């Protein structure tokens, strides 16, 4: 009887350790998926801006941090006072959420949810309508697991990225991020 109890308790301990590792793997997979799918949505917004010949802006839905909405810009073309009416939207699965200037994302990144001329999706002849640089940051719940969609001036495409952990010493660069 004691032997059975020992075996059952060992199995319980081992399975609990496996579940904890599995939950971390699930979180990593979900944030990677959110980054890749958000990158595809950003490309779609850029194409939509060119097709409609309009300036579009990204905003986090006030009712849901899992949803990004696309709205038309006003006459200033700097996303400072977007018009009402959602042109498109995209949602990711909870507990992943879109965040503005998170502690886990590089401080050098221009946040596309902001209000200035550098964050507007503008039709540009021969180039993608995405802003020249910057991106979007995604966090998995309250954990230090992050996804990002970024663009820099040297590439004419958006890049989905991922990292686990928050080393505050490297928040000024993309050195500890992995491209997907």
Identify what each model region corresponds to:
Residues 17-29, 36, 47, 55, ...:
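N-terminal helix-rich module
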Residues 1-23:
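N-terminal single-pass transmembrane signal-anchor helix
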Residues 8, 32, 39:
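Conserved catalytic core of two-component sensor histidine kinases
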Residues 40-44:
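Phosphate-interacting basic helix/loop segments used at nucleotide- and nucleic-acid interfaces
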